[in-house]
């Protein structure tokens, strides 16, 4: 075909005619793409396109017609050699700039090739030799084109003639120039559609004879500019001006995929595509970066990579001004502004703005994972996932932060890290105005509002908000644990769990609180900790409106309303609403206590219990109340303490309507109604409402007092008793009454004191109906009915109703007076006696009569005084029935009957 057309052209010259309209040029065998088509080519396909163009050019050279495509038609008269530029090539070069590729790339390969034109054999003269310096004109004009300047129109227009000197067209005679100017001005009237379809071949004559410019330049013969379309498609009826374009067009009709990959069986339209594809299997990377030594399979990938070193981002978005290294990235970015998502999944209807995203998404439905790791044989749905995974084995971290020098193995990780320095959060939720640093996080957050859970497990039908959650969930069914610790060989189902676990070995705590300086191993722990400073509670229960700091805590709380207990013990059948509770419960059966204290070798079944225990040795109290500055060892203590200030009582008894600040208090209170005492002492069979009471009671039998005061070496059976005792030395009274501002060293004392203001007496005797402010008072009162005296003196065998009475009695034998007055040095055997004595020095009289405003230093004096106002005579003589207002008068009266004081 090519040789036949070349022969026709030689015949045309022999007959002295103008070149035929359909003469073969490099354009005729070039495969050209529209801008829209070019955008869909990936870097590998663009590199392949370049190679095909060069191969076509070499074929033209082989049939000896390349000079007719490259140079201007020179109608020679035998004058010497001259250098010319094919302006049509320049115009086409400028018209076909597409993305980051242009014919300049091809021109670099062939611009030094010299062509020899032989004179027509009929004339017998040697034609002048033309050397093609550059296919595309000067580099200045090429740069102007990239800069946005358009000095030369795509067709023959008014600006063409004005730029002839820039195109290096030499020795143009005035007559020729005039005709050329006329032709260009006439050609400017050609319509836009005609300009696109026309391929002008500018013929500048050098003849001194009767052959000035060829008449083919005249606009009225526009068919000269129009190629003959002599290659029709039988399927669609569309015609093309060269066979290569026809072959390209026919591929979709024919479905001809004749080149097959021997490894994976994939089919390709072109041999060159297959050659590029094979590099995926062979791992061949012939293109190497001189800066960092990294290799690439395709030259276009190397070109893009170079921009990482140079920082060049030549592609700019006209909407927002954002710049990109690759044109494909710009095209993808533009879809954000347009909102266009042309690629739709036939399975679920989800739409995407990229074909690659659709292909990747479809693998979720098919489960195909074509990319396999050669080291651990793990398979992935995307090649990029495999590339990221490979860096785990190699330890490569190619992306470095310019701010802090930290390196990352993914570009996305570096981009995420940069946001920590900038604090930028450009993505905002329209529902709740919450802002996010990543778009994916915003999309995930939106599902909280919509309730959408698009990812469903095929085994158990559980639905999830995120694909990562589904992937993690699948490992529950498969039992897969692919991540292994090199230190202790422990395996994990998540990579994040492995990374966190490694910090146990390294001791690394990379997350630091800016408020208090505390460091944490996990970012989630830091986020949760920050809420302690801000008191932020973002998660709200829709049933009771209670708010929580963590979503996981809300999920656990919701099960209180639903009574759902999904975690069941296989040993005893007991069910739990939390996985951690089940794990903890299992250790009761196994007796396992894996957590050991390095200070005292004590072992614990829970890690949290060990962490709490360690603070006994260190004295650390990291949890501080922002209201009164009291510090606590545990967060639960701080949470409980906070309710003192807020007065919050969220737990309500369904029997009597009483409310409590703590759930444990409600559970304990319910047993009062039921009379339930589930916990029994193994020594004396005494039953108790709470397990902790049994533990305390057991120490009476064993005599164990493990808690010792560092100040006075006094020991206690309960830790709470030691804490209360320490306040005697420190003088600390952290509990304050909001009514009278009186302070107390114990919370229980404050609660009892509050009942003085409220008049509340919640404890009632079932035998006589008497009510009491304190539970201990009721217990003591019941012994009056039963006659029980549980506390016996080991010296004189005297028994007492209360333990405090026994303790006081023992001091008679020991003569101990531990309570000493700082003012006068007088000592007392009871704290109450010392308090009463202090009032002598201070003159304090805290007890006031509401009737006459008289004040007293003792409560007993106030009670005796009140009888004057009420006329009450509670003390009655059993002999004669006479009543008296005070007990001393009754005793004096009884002497008349011969009754002594101790009878």
Swiss-Prot record:
Main localisation: nucleus
BP GO annotations: cell differentiation; negative regulation of gene expression; pancreas development; regulation of transcription by RNA polymerase II
Record-given protein name: Zinc finger protein 808
Gene Ontology MF term list: transcription cis-regulatory region binding; zinc ion binding
Compartments (UniProt record): Nucleus
Entries under CDD domains matching the protein: KRAB_A-box
Family according to the record: Belongs to the krueppel C2H2-type zinc-finger protein family.
PROSITE patterns: KRAB, ZINC_FINGER_C2H2_1, ZINC_FINGER_C2H2_2
Species of origin: Homo sapiens
Zinc finger (C2H2-type): 231-253, 259-281, 287-309, 315-337, 343-365, 371-393, 399-421, 427-449, 455-477, 483-505, 511-533, 539-561, 567-589, 595-617, 623-645, 651-673, 679-701, 707-729, 735-757, 763-785, 791-813, 819-841, 847-869, 875-897
Keyword Zinc-finger: yes
PANTHER family named among the record's database cross-references: ZINC FINGER PROTEIN, ZINC FINGER PROTEIN 845
Disulphide bond pairs: none
Record InterPro entries: Ikaros_C2H2-ZF (IPR050589), KRAB (IPR001909), KRAB_dom_sf (IPR036051), Znf_C2H2_sf (IPR036236), Znf_C2H2_type (IPR013087)
Residue span(s) of domain KRAB: 24-98
Region: Disordered, residue numbers: 121-154
Disease in which the protein is involved: Genetic variation in ZNF808 is associated with non-syndromic neonatal diabetes. Homozygous truncation variants were identified in patients with pancreatic agenesis, a rare congenital condition resulting from inappropriate pancreas development. Pancreatic agenesis is defined by neonatal diabetes, which is diagnosed before 6 months of age, and exocrine pancreatic insufficiency.
Tissue specificity annotation: Broadly expressed.
Covalent link (Glycyl lysine isopeptide (Lys-Gly) (interchain with G-Cter in SUMO2)) residue numbers: 173
């Amino acid at each position: 075909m090519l040789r036949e057309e070349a022969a026709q052209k030689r015949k045309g010259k022999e007959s002295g005619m103008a070149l035929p309209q359909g003469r073969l040029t490099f354009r005729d065998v070039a495969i050209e793409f529209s801008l829209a088509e070019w955008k869909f080519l990936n870097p590998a396909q663009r590199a392949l396109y370049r190679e095909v163009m060069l191969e076509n050019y070499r074929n033209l050279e082989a049939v000896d017609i390349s000079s007719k495509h490259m140079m201007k038609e020179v109608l020679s008269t035998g004058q010497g050699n001259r250098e010319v530029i094919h302006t049509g090539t320049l115009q086409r070069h400028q018209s076909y700039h597409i993305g980051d590729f242009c014919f300049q790339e091809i021109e670099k390969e062939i611009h030094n090739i010299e062509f020899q034109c032989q004179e027509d054999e009929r004339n017998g003269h040697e034609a002048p030799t033309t050397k093609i310096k550059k296919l595309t004109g000067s580099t200045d004009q090429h740069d102007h084109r990239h800069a946005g300047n358009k000095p030369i129109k795509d067709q023959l227009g008014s600006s063409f003639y004005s730029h002839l000197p820039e195109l290096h067209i030499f020795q143009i005679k005035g007559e020729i120039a005039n005709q050329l100017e006329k032709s260009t001005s006439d050609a400017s009237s050609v319509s836009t559609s005609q300009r696109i379809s026309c391929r002008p071949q500018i013929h500048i004559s050098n003849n001194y004879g009767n052959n000035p410019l060829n008449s083919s330049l005249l606009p009225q013969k526009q068919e000269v500019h129009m190629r003959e379309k002599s290659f029709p498609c039988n399927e669609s009826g569309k015609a093309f001006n060269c066979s290569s374009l026809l072959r390209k067009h026919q591929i979709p009709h024919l479905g001809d995929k004749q080149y097959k990959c021997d490894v994976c069986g994939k089919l390709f339209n072109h041999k060159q595509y297959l050659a590029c594809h094979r590099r995926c299997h062979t791992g061949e990377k012939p293109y190497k970066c001189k800066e960092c030594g990294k290799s690439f399979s395709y030259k276009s990938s190397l070109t893009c990579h170079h921009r990482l070193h140079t920082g060049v981002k030549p592609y700019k978005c006209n909407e927002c001004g954002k710049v990109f290294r690759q044109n494909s990235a710009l095209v993808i970015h533009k879809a954000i502004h347009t909102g266009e998502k042309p690629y739709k999944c036939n399975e679920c209807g989800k739409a995407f703005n990229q074909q690659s995203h659709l292909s990747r998404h479809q693998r979720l439905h098919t489960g195909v994972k074509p990319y396999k790791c050669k080291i651990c044989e793990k398979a992935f749905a995307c090649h990029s996932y495999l590339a990221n995974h490979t860096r785990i084995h190699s330890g490569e971290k190619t992306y470095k932060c310019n701010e802090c020098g930290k390196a990352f193995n993914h570009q996305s990780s570096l981009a995420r890290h940069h946001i920590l320095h900038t604090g930028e959060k450009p993505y905002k939720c329209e529902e709740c105005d919450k802002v996010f640093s990543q778009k994916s996080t915003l999309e995930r957050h939106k599902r909280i509002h919509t309730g959408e859970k698009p990812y469903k497990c095929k085994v158990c039908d559980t639905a999830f908000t995120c694909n990562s959650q589904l992937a993690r969930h699948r490992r529950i069914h498969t039992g897969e644990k692919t991540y292994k610790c090199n230190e202790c060989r422990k395996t994990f189902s998540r990579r994040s769990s492995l990374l966190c676990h490694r910090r146990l070995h390294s001791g690394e705590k990379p997350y630091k609180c800016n408020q208090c300086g505390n460091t944490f191993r996990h970012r989630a722990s830091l986020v949760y900790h920050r809420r302690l400073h801000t008191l932020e509670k973002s998660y709200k229960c829709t049933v009771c409106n209670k708010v929580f700091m963590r979503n996981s805590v809300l999920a656990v709380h919701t099960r209180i309303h639903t009574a759902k207990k999904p975690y069941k013990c296989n040993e005893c059948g007991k069910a739990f609403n939390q996985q951690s509770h089940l794990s903890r419960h299992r250790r009761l059966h196994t007796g396992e206590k894996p957590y050991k204290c390095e200070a005292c070798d004590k072992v614990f079944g829970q890690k949290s219990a060990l962490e709490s225990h360690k603070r006994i040795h260190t004295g650390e109290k990291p949890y501080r109340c922002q209201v009164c500055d009291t510090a606590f060892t545990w967060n639960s203590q701080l949470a409980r303490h906070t309710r003192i200030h807020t007065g919050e009582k969220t737990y309500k008894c369904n029997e009597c309507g009483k409310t409590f600040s703590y759930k444990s208090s409600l559970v304990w209170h319910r047993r009062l109604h039921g009379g339930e005492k589930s916990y029994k002492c193994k020594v004396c069979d005494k039953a108790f409402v709470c397990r902790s009471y049994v533990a305390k009671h057991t120490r009476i039998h064993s005599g164990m007092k493990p808690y010792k005061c560092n100040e006075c070496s006094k020991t206690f059976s309960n830790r709470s008793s030691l804490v209360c005792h320490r306040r005697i030395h420190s003088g600390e009274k952290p509990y304050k009454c909001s009514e009278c501002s009186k302070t107390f060293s114990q919370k229980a004392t404050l609660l009892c004191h509050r009942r003085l203001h409220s008049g509340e007496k919640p404890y009632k005797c079932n035998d006589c109906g008497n009510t009491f402010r304190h539970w201990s008072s009721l217990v003591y009162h019941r012994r009056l009915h039963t006659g029980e005296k549980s506390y016996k003196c080991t010296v004189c065998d005297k028994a007492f109703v209360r333990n405090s009475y026994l303790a006081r009695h023992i001091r008679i034998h020991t003569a101990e007076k531990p309570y000493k007055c700082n003012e006068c040095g007088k000592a007392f055997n009871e704290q109450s006696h010392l308090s009463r004595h202090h009032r002598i020095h201070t003159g304090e009289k805290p007890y006031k009569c509401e009737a006459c405003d008289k004040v007293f230093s003792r409560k007993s004096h106030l009670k005796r005084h009140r009888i004057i106002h009420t006329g009450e005579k509670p003390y009655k003589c059993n002999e004669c029935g006479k009543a008296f207002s005070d007990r001393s008068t009754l005793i004096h009266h009884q002497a008349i009957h011969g009754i002594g004081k101790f009878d």
